[in-house]
Amino acid sequence: MDLDRITRPLRLAKGSYQPESGMGCVMNAISYIGGDTQVTDFPATSARPLAAFVQLCNDLLAGPDGYLSSESSFLALELGWQTVGTAVVTDTVIHAWVGELLTSPAWGVVQYADNVAVEAIFDIADLHRALASGEMPPIAAWHSADCAARAVCATLAGAGVYAVRAAYQSTALVDTERCETLDAVTGNALRCHELATKSTGADRIVEVTRDAIRSWRRLAQLDHPSHIESASVDNALDT
């Protein structure tokens, strides 16, 4: 792939695309490649939570000048490409994925929590998993878990705050607008990971993002995407 060609219509950089700037994040590039009417941080073919994970990787991979190197650009594009085709999934997939977002041993936010916070997060994750498996936990159970997590959160600091916040905000997925709630849950989970791994630079966040994307695709039973194709990028960016 001739990554230098991206610098003509769009050079990968920290932040979001601004018209006429010639700069944008990797999800802006995916949006452009996919033919969205307007270049956006959340391409139509990509699940919003996964796009948010990749955006954070993009920003952490940027150099001191705000731009991504050719090597970092390729890594970011590979991650972004893995989100293509993930936008449309069932509520069952959403709940199962949130359960993993909270408590997966590899990438769940529970790893940054202690003691009663761990219990509060697992209680909520168990409700999501139950719902994903076809059970219908009573609203009272969701409310009780929400209240318990909020009480715990008031005693915490640092990454643990955002871990528990992601958990209790996710209880609203059962009876409110899914998009806005999922954005809030994902945002808190990302902030949790960012605070807990800030000493490792982008490496750990890239690893977590790969896990998050793999989890989503597995739960949705989506085919494993191929590697990003040079022709797809070159044709889409041909001006």
How should each PLM-predicted stretch be described?
Residues 1-239:
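Short, glycine-biased loop/turn motifs at secondary-structure junctions and
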